[in-house]
Amino acid sequence: MSAHEAGSSGRRRPATFHLHIYPQLPSAGSQTSCRVTATKDSTTSDVIRDVVASLHLDGSKHYVLVEVKESGGEEWVLDASDSPVHRVLLWPRRAQKEHPREDGYYFLLQERNADGSIQYLHVQLLAQPTAACRLVERGLLPRPQADFDDLCNLPELNEANLLQSLKLRFVQQKIYTYAGSILVAINPFKFLPIYNPKYVKMYENQQLGKLEPHVFALADVAYYTMLRKHVNQCIVISGESGSGKTQSTNFLIHCLTALSQKGYASGVERTILGAGPVLEAFGNAKTAHNNNSSRFGKFIQVNYLESGIVRGAVVEKYLLEKSRLVSQEKDERNYHVFYYLLLGVSEEERQEFQLKQPQDYFYLNQHNLNIEDGEDLKHDFERLQQAMEMVGFLPATKKQIFSVLSAILYLGNVTYKKRATGRDEGLEVGPPEVLDTLSQLLKVKRETLVEVLTKRKTITVNDKLILPYSLSEAITARDSMAKSLYSALFDWIVLRINHALLNKKDMEEAVSCLSIGVLDIFGFEDFERNSFEQFCINYANEQLQYYFTQHIFKLEQEEYQGEGISWHNIDYTDNVGCIHLISKKPTGLFYLLDEESNFPHATSHTLLAKFKQQHEDNKYFLGTPVLEPAFIIQHFAGRVKYQIKDFREKNMDYMRPDIVALLRGSDSSYVRQLIGMDPVAVFRWAVLRAAIRAMAVLREAGRLRAERAEKAEAGVSSPVTRSHVEELPRGANTPSEKLYRDLHNQIIKSLKGLPWQGEDPRRLLQSLSRLQKPRTFFLKSKGIKQKQIIPKNLLDSKSLRLIISMTLHDRTTKSLLHLHKKKKPPSISAQFQTSLNKLLEALGKAEPFFIRCIRSNAEKKELCFDDELVLQQLRYTGMLETVRIRRSGYSAKYTFQDFTEQFQVLLPKDVQPCREAIAALLEKLQVDRQNYQIGKTKVFLKETERQALQERLHGEVLRRILLLQSWFRMVLERRHFVQMKHAALTIQACWRSYRVRRTLERTRAAVYLQAAWRGYLQRQAYHHQRHSIIRLQSLCRGHLQRRSFSQMMLEKQKAEQARETAGAEMSEGEPSPVAAGEQPSEHPVEDPESLGVETETWMNSKSPNGLSPKKEIPSPEMETPAQKTVPAESHEKVPSSREKRESRRQRGLEHVERQNKHIQSCREENSTLREPSRKASLETGESFPEDTKEPREDGLETWTETAAPSCPKQVPIVGDPPRSPSPLQRPASLDLDSRVSPVLPSSSLESPQDEDKGENSTKVQDKPESPSGSTQIQRYQHPDTERLATAVEIWRGKKLASAMLSQSLDLSEKPRTAGAALTPTEERRISFSTSDVSKLSPVKTSTEVDGDLSAKKPAGHKKKSEDPSAGPDAGLPTGSQGDSKSAFKRLFLHKAKDKKPSLEGVEETEGSGGQAAQEAPARKTLDVPSSQQHRHTTGEKPLKGKKNRNRKVGQITVSEKWRESVFRKITNANELKFLDEFLLNKVNDLRSQKTPIESLFIEATERFRSNIKTMYSVPNGKIHVGYKDLMENYQIVVSNLAAERGEKDTNLVLNVFQSLLDEFTRSYNKTDFEPVKGKAQKKKRKQERAVQEHNGHVFASYQVNIPQSCEQCLSYIWLMDKALLCSVCKMTCHKKCVHKIQSYCSYTGRRKSELGAEPGHFGVCVDSLTSDKASVPIVLEKLLEHVEMHGLYTEGLYRKSGAANRTRELRQALQTDPATVKLEDFPIHAITGVLKQWLRELPEPLMTFAQYGDFLRAVELPEKQEQLAAIYAVLDHLPEANHTSLERLIFHLVKVALLEDVNRMSPGALAIIFAPCLLRCPDNSDPLTSMKDVLKITTCVEMLIKEQMRKYKVKMEEINHLEAAESIAFRRLSLLRQNAPWPLKLGFSSPYEGVRTKSPRTPVVQDLEELGALPEEAAGGDEDREKEILMERIQSIKEEKEDITYRLPELDPRGSDEENLDSETSASTESLLEERAVRGAAEE
């Protein structure tokens, strides 16, 4: 596909692309392809339409466009809306231009049938394999040869079967095959998508041979073998050129770093991964056999700690092929870096380095250069630059490198020609522009350069000769200069890479390290023309072949023979003779070459003659015809002919001294550094030069400053200068000076109230001076991290010496830079032998793994298998013999001791490591005797048997674990059974005893009934007999009396008649005594029931003097006449009037008690029935006269005395007619106050709820002889019948009351006025006293029990504004009133001014009552429970929004408002944020006083504010608590703080906070708390994490270091590109392909399907419980919030377990519906137990299984900072739901650990408890290993908690500093506004630190002296500008504080350098203003 832009009209018309479509139709004929034009917006239907029109196809048919990718083996049918151009852009670049079929990426046009199916022409070809398989199944065709992944498993071992097996696997694109533990890799010359990270995970910790052969498998085995055996390992990669050694090395390094880093790539891993591309660019080139041939050898040794963490690495290079720089053969190229540079640089860089095109350079264009992959080379240059940055090259360093490369290319363009005229025999060098450019690039003089390139200087004893070069000598000198310069550059790059890979701790401490070495050395080469380089390369391959045969054949067979096991020796080809031919002293070819090179007149012919003379009879040395200057050596891989030309010159290839002197005199320090002999010496000289230059610069700067100072002194000063202001008289009495001093003193006094807390105020005042005139030089800001100017990992002499010592043997270039040395440097061959021997020595100390790389074909064709070439390589590598010995040998070898330790579980207990025990075990396990042998000291096993033993060991361990578990479960079950049995026996015994007692009781009852019945019968008979007798007697007596009476009557009549007649004349005026005696009988006696029972209380209240009932005891004379009268006819004894009164009182009290119980039960039935009963009570109640004019001065004293239980008996009094116009009537029902408050020892008082309404509240006193002792009766009367006054409870027990009263405030000595109310402190004490006395009461009535079951709310009252004597501190002791009165009085007085005056809050709405009706907490708290609230509101008539106009402001009490606000719910986090700011303002108002009670209040409020911050900063932003929980939390904080300080009285503090909370709820509406979507809202969460989730995948950014493929589009991912990697399933894809993925993650998808059947909240995956609105599961959030509100101060919070039944109940409730669960009903330990249970039951822990190994490896890092960085890096790859939930949980644990002194929960204890819940090992892991990992798991969680604690403290300290600065700025702004008209403004002392200090406060006088005016401030300024700055600063501080607050819970992975920057910034708060000022100036 080719693209064409539209030129200047490109903006209007999009680019067009040419697509090649290959029709696959029957009617297409001979048409091979069709070319159409399309754009990125063209769809598939548009392209098909163009193709049909171009090919003249039948338009009525249906066609489809098919995308073919042969690499993936798939065909994709494009939809009609797809864009073919977009698909092409995803292909490799080589296939994008023309995309022929040969590249494997093309489009097909196919025909679609009517049913939608596609007609495939090649379907017959596809059907052939299927038909063949059917024939094989029927037995008609022979079965194909089996696919053996291990050549040792071949049934018949020969070359043919070996070759056939490899070819069969190669055709199936299986390029890896095992030969025992040796890996055979065949180069396919094509990228295969088998190297993605998921393959690394697949082969991790797997046995060799369990999965398909792979290079990752060998790397994994080497890594874990090193960790298991603690022995160094090495991987030797061998093979001829083009066999894929370099690529295999890259794969190995990638896998080893991936196994080590496990999600956390430190600097060493990144450098190792980046070093490969850099070395390949500078050391690899394209040859005829290989497009990426290594022209040098390298050995990368990766050092590990014993835990498997990378410690460092060393790269050693061997014999760079320098001759390739100046000459190449046909179809070969120079080093890659030149082409990258020329084709990839930008135009600016091209001009800077003066670069041309590759065809313009002689070193690059020697055989008609034709570059076809230009686009790929451009991208390779970008990847090279990225790799150089990973290694640590700075941009300036890269420019220096590219400048040297450009100079090398220009050296090749230097031409020579002989001078045409003159006697001068010299040469002319040119062209001039090349010389000019070269001198500029190298920074040398042009004349010196020309002289060096054309003349040679020779120094003799007496003379210095300058001789011109011949033409050939000049060219040789030029090329030698270029080669030496490039070699020096390559050495310098290797040196810098080693420095970057060096661990600086290796210079300070000696730590035992392990290592894995990967050898990638040049392969065996046999070209058409072989020279000195091929001779050295093949010698190195001979050494490696010898090393291979030594380990595979010789050493192993010798070990078998030494152990005495039966073994038949296997013959192998030994190449030691060839090695001796080349390197044996003194006749080896290398030594002969060195001798001949030292002879001045020797030539190549003399050298060849000497070779033939010495080795004519050697079978490995073959001569050639005399005329041919060459010789032949018989290598292990075959015969190679070497051309003898240039052997001597290349062996002594070094710079001439004049060239070295030229480059060392360069003005470029980099060039001098390259040519320097000793890098350490060069570095030291550079340091010295830099120091001298710095001194010179400083001296010059000092001189210039002195000159400016002199000029300034000599000049004329300005009218207003600093000196003028300072010279003003301090004691002047000018008005401005006096005004200044007064204002200064005023400020100093006001500053005393600021939050110094014992600190120096000047420390904070320093920020204010900067507020007036912002400076632009102070740029440090919290949100901006300054770019690092000084780079890290700078060179130093110590590290350089260490690197030089490690690579001393490889100084091939530096050894040739000797100047004027008498002793010649060593030759190239000598240095090569030295470095090769060093390499073999390192390999000999390690256990080797071998990879045999084989070239599939010589033409570099993709997936082409050349049988002959492959067979040749198999033969010379001895693969057949290798397979044979691997097949017959024993790969597993154990000493007896190692075997016993390894398989101890399988052996008997306490067995000795001996031959007999091991043999018995193997016999017992029935191991095949053919697969093992036992030698003298070792056991030899085949790999299959070793794996079988490992499996048996694993199974035995699992069996024993299960056995232990079963035993433990048995013990638990037995214990449970015994407990159940004991419980059953106890229940049975109780039941039997109950039955016996029941029988006895029934028997006794029967006997009692019988006795009663018998007695009844006897009494009945007796009474009947007595009644009969009495009746008879009465009849008899009556008869006698009547008879006597009749006689008397007759006699009387007679006497009367006689008397009437005789006394008719007597006087009629005197009354008779009988009439006077009958007068009282006409008046009926009044019923005692009609009298009132407690009228004496009313009488007492109406007494003029207000005396107590004790002082006005009614006398017996005050009784009613009815009580004093006795009937005249009564002959029996009548009870006295006192006894009658007592009986009436007793009956009245009993009736009241019955009424009390009845009303109490009625109130609990239904709230709707209360109002009618209250109305009935009002209608039938007593009517008392009202007298509001007399103030009740002794009300409190009256209450105190009436409370005494020993008052004398009171007699009901019937008032006289004038005072009682209507008789007292008994009410139909008595309304009793059910809110019976218990009694506390601290007080014996109870204040009425509405005491200030008048004197109408009646008081009732119990009878002392009452057995219940606490039954009370209260009557209510009020002229306004809308609401009734609340009741006052009375109690008994005079001694107890007196004792309690003595402990409380002596209130009886302080009589109150009529309007005085109880203080909040008194009310709270009363509330507390009631509960304690109720506990002490031994006998309780029903009323008392009901009062004890409900928590009481204190009735707080506000004093009337008219009463100046009463105040909030009226109840305090005398000594403390004066201290605390001012502040608290100010607090309560000023809040009425700035808050809403509305009285709407007084009324209780129906909503709050209904809500309270649902809650019934049983805890003893300060708030009122719902049931109590209902009882309180029973007697009140709800007003439903109407104001009670009869109530005054003074009657609105705090307690009434608290009842309303306590049940108010918190809707969102902003409400808590407003409350936090509200409390901050209130606390700042109270900081001026330092009384103990205020100090307690301030500190408690600060702690409470910290709790609020942690609440509204949680991720969810949702609050599940109310103000009731806040009040309880504050009470807990105050209680603990008071216990620490020894304070006993905390009631006043609680009352103050209660009033503040009440004021806050009245001051704000719910609409004020609605979140505003703006800048502040965005700060609530941190920036978007680097993790991207899709379909269960957790993708993170990933830099590709080896060839990989996208698993979605199957296209190539370029090296060093950014891709996305799933941290769970290791899926890799392009960033643009993420949203196209339709498959779910292999792990998370399975979990969701398994858990979908049982919905709930326990045992469910975290991501299923979260959503966009709820980022944290509701169960977790609700449990954590409740614990943080009520349980942080509980000792052993998570250590103790709750009740099992309560825990189960809570779990079941949360499982059903968490939103409806009331956690207040459950104990705190049950809640914590459910929290731990929820975490344990997660299918996958919060710290997921995928990151389990990563966390363990992070803990194993040596340094704490590295551990923390690794842990946070792994946390960043967690899924979003897990990360957010873990963040919330860790934040909770931090809050718990901060209170370790109280709850005894340290970070270590919390880690022990929560580590098994958060970080569990996978189920398929080894149990033994998992047990060892417990300590690491605990350490990981503990470190996380401690680090988050540290960050939390740092952030809170920053917030405190910001609040202090905000307070100062606000005070300053207030003063400026108050004093705006004044001409002078206050100055402050200049800052000297920028942070708050702990120094003691200085006296005021000293403050006045030091807080003087700054001169620049005294000069005047713009106060308006200062106000603006202050307002901006306050706003900036608020934003900064809010940002820090919202970042409190974050698991922030920032590094230490950024943390230091942040801490410095936060410590100096003025930086905020400076940054804002700078930004504003920049914007302007």
Curated annotation (Swiss-Prot):
Domain (IQ): residue spans on this chain? 958-978, 981-1001, 1002-1024, 1025-1054
Q: Where is this region: Disordered?
A: 715-736, 1049-1281, 1302-1380, 1394-1449, 1891-1923, 1937-1980
Where does the record place the modification Phosphoserine? Answer: 717-718, 1046, 1108, 1115, 1177, 1220, 1222, 1229, 1237, 1243, 1247, 1266, 1268, 1304, 1327, 1329, 1337, 1649, 1886, 1932, 1952, 1959
Task: List residues of the Ras-associating domain.
Answer: 15-114
Give a yes or no for keyword Lyase in this entry. no
Q: Where are the zinc fingers (Phorbol-ester/DAG-type)?
A: 1592-1641
Q: Where does ATP bind?
A: G239, E240, S241, G242, S243, G244, K245, T246
Where in or outside the cell it occurs: the entry states:
Cytoplasm, Cell cortex; Cytoplasm, Perinuclear region; Cytoplasm, Cytoskeleton
Q: Residue span of the signal peptide, if any? A: none
| Subunit structure of this chain's protein | Interacts (via IQ domains) with CALM. Interacts with RHOA. Interacts (via Rho-GAP domain) with ROBO1; this inhibits the interaction with RHOA and the stimulation of RHOA GTPase activity, and thereby increases the levels of active RHOA.
State the similarity comment.
Answer: Belongs to the TRAFAC class myosin-kinesin ATPase superfamily. Myosin family.
Q: Write down what this protein is called.
A: Unconventional myosin-IXb
Origin species, per record, is: Rattus norvegicus (Rat)
